[in-house]
């Protein structure tokens, strides 16, 4: 019995950002009412017309176009008085934003800041695989010269007048720059999976360990396991 008491882990606050639920209360209501939150892929995430084919043997396509999608969420760091400069926030993957939102909700649920906690002994341990989708968008912009180089080798493109070829490349580059994020010193920190936990720790000024566990589909369980082990060892509170 003593061992069971020693190993008990208290959940003192909860937060969530999930499909059809940008807070834990709404998520629980959705579960209670049996709400179904699986839907077709939104075009602004990835266009099924470009990437979907029902035949699983077709290369470079997916045979599924459904999933659980977080669509609209209220990201208001200035209103929440979070120390995130606008330019930094602009370069942040939505996964980092969701993590900060969930952490903020969990802290408020706990009673923070009226109910104190020891920031020096507060750890941030999250589970994530492959970060989010922001790095795909910046990669498309970065690698555009690779695509134009391959285009230059196509016989039908080579047969075009130089002015037409130049116009095609310049107009396409203009579209890429309009639709895909620019590259800055904030790009890489805004995309990396191992920055997610660090971002939460920095925003809320927590000084304990912070890291992101990546175990593919078991990332959440790996994070739980690591967090529980640290609590049991007294590494943090």
Where are the language model's segments positioned?
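Short glycine/threonine-rich loop-to-helix capping motif typified by GTGT followed
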Residues: 129-141, 222-225
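Conserved small-residue
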Residues: 11-15, 31, 103, 124, ...
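Acyl-CoA/ACP chain-elongation machinery
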Residues: 39-42, 190, 205-208, 228-237
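Conserved catalytic cysteine-centered active-site region
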Residues: 5-6, 69-80, 94, 153-226
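Active-site-proximal alpha-helical scaffold in enzymes
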Residues: 18, 97-115, 196, 211-237
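ACP-dependent fatty acid/polyketide chain-elongation machinery
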Residues: 1-88, 96, 100, 108, ...
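Flexible, glycine/charged-enriched surface loops at secondary-structure junctions
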Residues: 44, 114-120
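Extended hydrophobic secondary-structure segments that form protein cores and membrane-embedded regions
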Residues: 121-128
């Amino acid at each position: 019995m003593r061992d069971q008491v020693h190993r008990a882990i208290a959940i003192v606050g909860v937060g969530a950002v999930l499909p059809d639920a940008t807070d834990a209360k709404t998520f629980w209501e959705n579960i209670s009412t049996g709400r179904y939150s699986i839907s077709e892929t939104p075009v602004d995430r990835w266009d099924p017309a470009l990437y979907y084919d029902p035949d699983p043997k077709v290369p470079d396509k997916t045979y599924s176009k459904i999933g659980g999608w977080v669509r609209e969420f209220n990201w208001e760091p200035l209103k929440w008085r979070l120390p995130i400069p606008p330019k930094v926030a602009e370069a942040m993957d939505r996964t980092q934003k969701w993590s900060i939102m969930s952490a903020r909700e969990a802290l408020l649920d706990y009673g923070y800041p009226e109910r104190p906690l020891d920031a020096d002994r507060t750890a941030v341990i999250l589970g994530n695989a492959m970060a989010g989708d922001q790095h795909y968008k910046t990669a498309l912009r970065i690698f555009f010269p690779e695509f134009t180089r391959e285009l230059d080798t196509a016989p039908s493109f080579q047969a075009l007048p130089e002015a037409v070829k130049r116009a095609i490349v310049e107009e396409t580059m203009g579209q890429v720059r309009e639709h895909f994020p620019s590259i800055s010193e904030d790009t890489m920190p805004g995309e990396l999976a191992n920055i997610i936990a660090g971002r939460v720790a920095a925003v809320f000024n927590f000084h304990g360990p912070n890291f992101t566990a990546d175990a593919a589909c078991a990332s959440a369980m790996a994070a739980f396991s690591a967090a529980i082990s640290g609590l049991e060892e007294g590494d943090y509170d």
